[in-house]
């Protein structure tokens, strides 16, 4: 029997001229996309625009699956064994970190019941009970004090607007910040009225425990929280 040997297929490689031509063709589109992403990341804060902040969170959330796909692609089309080894390590690390993100987000969701638990930027959720409605908003840092400000009926917590139609008498005695492993309780330590419809209050961290629900009572705080 006659056996035929197939010639190996040549490996296609980009030349410098092709790379320059690609940049010339897609430079405008890439510039617009990078400008859009930069603006979103720069100005995406809850204290500025909630819509822009949500778009920012979507972009950050998409980074993980995109990174995993690119790492897997590098594993399939690795240039050599060294690149293959690094690609496998990066793929495993990316998948583990993504799984950890979902595990922590689900734990935080069980604690708060808020979809803000899946925020990829932070695991700190500030919970404020106003007239029986619990407002949950993400905060970046673990603050020792929280500030509530009311300006002509508009309520702001740490600079984030929560709603309108409130007065200083509506401010709760306690505010909570939920984390993955515990819940921090902040007690109102100072209240000052600027005029008849404006003022502010300062809350100081007073208690840390493993609870599921934020307090919604001015007294009897331990009975208002369900221990996990």
Swiss-Prot record:
One annotated Gene Ontology cellular component of this protein: membrane
Protein name as annotated: Membrane protein
Keyword annotations: Glycoprotein, Host Golgi apparatus, Host membrane, Host-virus interaction, Membrane, Transmembrane, Transmembrane helix, Viral envelope protein, Viral immunoevasion, Viral matrix protein, Virion
Claim: Transmembrane is one of the keywords in the record: yes
Main location: virion
InterPro entries linked to this entry: M_CoV, M_HCoV-like
Positions of glycan attachment: 2
TM regions (residue ranges): 26-46, 57-77, 86-106
Main function: Component of the viral envelope that plays a central role in virus morphogenesis and assembly via its interactions with other viral proteins.
Residue ranges, Intravirion side: 47-56, 107-228
Lineage: Viruses, Riboviria, Orthornavirae, Pisuviricota, Pisoniviricetes
Membrane disposition: Multi-pass membrane protein
Topology Virion surface: residue spans: 2-25, 78-85
Family classification: Belongs to the betacoronaviruses M protein family.
GO MF annotations, alphabetized: structural constituent of virion
